[in-house]
């Protein structure tokens, strides 16, 4: 992203700040700025250019707990580290941030040291199923036939209410859902239904019956935090994760979903969303911001995993804020900011590829997969080592153009099935842009980029591999970094052992 006079900001931990660092590239090298906070306190990192000077700063809503009651001394519980290097941003990140990341509670374990079901480690493809009608069921079964099964279906609208409303009153479930779950599982696939782990609709029966007002996050004046989404126009309240009322609701939902619907676990949305400072006097945390938000969700998910998650089931969430890596078996990466002036770079896999499983790249198109971004997303998704797809299967066979996109996804899925020796626990090393016959195209919602891209990975055994993907509909002959030529057919990928 180009730096301008308008401040660029990153709200940690959340979708637009998965890690605690900002870097600035220039002709002289890279400047590195990182508040190294092992407690994952909420913070806003800002960078701004004015009159030729660039300023970096961290803004926080302080916790009352940061002031010592005896000495009245106020301490910010982290140290900010800065540095400069003649190399680029990737060198700075690996040199300085990765050692910090591996010293934190969330980055200390490799993927193999975590208790993740083997079936998930071997997963390659996700679908986003919506509703329970015949159109959806037909598309789901066609996807299983077309891609060869072993698909994870992330299921929305399995209850009786519209999106972003009536949270957390999902039960009773639509009676059509459990038989569909059974059918999909009998075909060798998995089903994970959606719930929200952060919002409570104040108009629900449960908000009154379970005293939801005592669980709500509060502003300094005692007012509620409310969020209104265009999907429902409902003023949902933001719930404080420290509340035992809310924790019990989430744990009860986990039990009910698994026991009554027989799913393979559940998806809990917005746990990794940006925290709010909470000033509720009846909550068991110091007023203000600080570490309570992360600690509360960490403890909630630890209890869920220890006492409520059935054998070989999983729990996953949206986005990839680093501190939530141990809380979930896999993270759905779909909200990363991007536009023609803001390009996504492989910063997260550079740091955490051997620590975490992810699926998707950014939001898959909602209505049309033929505009170019779907193909680009899945190329990048593959190269980042992420599990592919997260697409609505109803979109894949509506016409010949859509079928071609489905073919590309199948080609990459079949290739990925043979790469678990690298992608499961391996390290992303570097992005590769082959030269030669490698056209630049204007990708819808992303901007200009090459049709052929690549990446170098290192397997857990230390073996280096290069992947190259051609997202174009014609064959190209390109030159690799070692000077060798590679001819690559349309909508395919290749593995090259180094």
Q: What residue ranges belong to the model's regions?
A:
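Hydrophobic faces of well-ordered beta-strands that scaffold small-molecule active sites
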Residues: 125-127, 151-155, 191-194, 266-268, ...
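Short, acidic/polar
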Residues: 132-146, 246-259, 374
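Aromatic- and acidic-residue-enriched carbohydrate-binding clefts of CAZyme catalytic domains
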Residues: 152-175, 206-241, 274-298
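Active-site-adjacent "subsite" loops/lids of carbohydrate-active enzymes
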Residues: 175-183, 190-261, 337, 342-351
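Active-site neighborhood of glycoside hydrolase catalytic domains
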Residues: 238-330, 341
């Amino acid at each position: 992203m180009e730096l301008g006079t308008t401040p660029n900001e990153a709200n940690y931990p959340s979708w637009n700040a998965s890690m605690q660092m900002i870097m600035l590239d220039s002709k002289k090298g890279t400047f590195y700025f990182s508040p190294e906070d092992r407690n994952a306190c909420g913070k806003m990192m800002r960078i701004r250019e004015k009159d030729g000077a660039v300023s970096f700063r961290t803004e926080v809503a302080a916790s009352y707990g940061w002031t010592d009651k005896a000495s009245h001394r106020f301490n910010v519980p982290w140290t900010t580290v800065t540095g400069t290097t003649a190399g680029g941003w990737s060198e700075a990140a690996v040199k300085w941030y990765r050692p910090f990341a591996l010293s934190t509670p969330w980055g200390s374990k490799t993927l193999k040291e975590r208790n993740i079901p083997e079936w998930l480690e071997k997963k390659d493809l996700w679908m986003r199923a919506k509703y329970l009608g015949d159109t959806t069921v037909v598309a789901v079964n066609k996807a299983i036939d077309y891609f060869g099964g072993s698909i994870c279906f992330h299921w929305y609208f399995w209850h009786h209410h519209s999106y972003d409303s009536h949270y957390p009153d999902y039960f009773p479930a639509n009676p059509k859902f459990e038989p569909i779950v059974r059918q999909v599982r009998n075909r060798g696939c998995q089903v994970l239904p959606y719930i929200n782990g952060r919002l409570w609709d104040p108009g629900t029966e449960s908000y009154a019956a379970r005293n939801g007002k005592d669980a709500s996050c509060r502003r300094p004046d005692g007012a509620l935090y409310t969020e209104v989404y265009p999907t429902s126009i409902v003023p949902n309240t933001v719930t404080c994760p420290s509340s035992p009322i809310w924790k019990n609701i989430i744990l009860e939902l986990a039990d009910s979903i698994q026991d009554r619907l027989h799913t393979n676990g559940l998806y809990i949305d917005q746990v990794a969303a940006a925290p709010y400072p909470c000033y509720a006097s009846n909550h068991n945390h110091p007023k203000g911001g600080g570490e309570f938000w992360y600690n509360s969700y960490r403890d909630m998910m630890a209890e869920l995993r220890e006492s409520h998650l059935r054998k070989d089931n999983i729990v996953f969430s949206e986005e990839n804020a680093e501190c939530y890596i141990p809380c979930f078996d896999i993270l759905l990466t779909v909200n990363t900011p991007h536009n023609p002036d803001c390009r996504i770079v492989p910063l997260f896999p550079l740091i955490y590829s051997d620590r975490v499983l992810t699926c998707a790249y950014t939001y898959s198109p909602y209505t049309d997969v033929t505009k170019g971004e779907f193909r680009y997303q899945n190329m990048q998704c593959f190269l980042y080592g992420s599990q592919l797809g997260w697409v609505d299967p109803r979109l894949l066979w509506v016409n010949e153009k859509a079928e071609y996109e489905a073919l590309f996804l199948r080609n990459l899925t079949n290739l990925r099935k043979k790469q678990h020796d690298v992608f499961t626990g391996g390290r992303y090393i570097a992005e590769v842009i082959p030269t030669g016959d490698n056209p630049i195209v204007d990708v819808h919602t992303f901007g200009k980029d090459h049709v052929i891209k690549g990446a170098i990975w290192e397997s857990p055994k230390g073996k280096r591999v290069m992947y190259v993907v051609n997202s174009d509909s014609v064959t190209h002959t390109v030159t690799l970094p070692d000077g060798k030529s590679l001819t690559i057919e349309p909508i395919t990928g290749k593995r090259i052992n180094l």
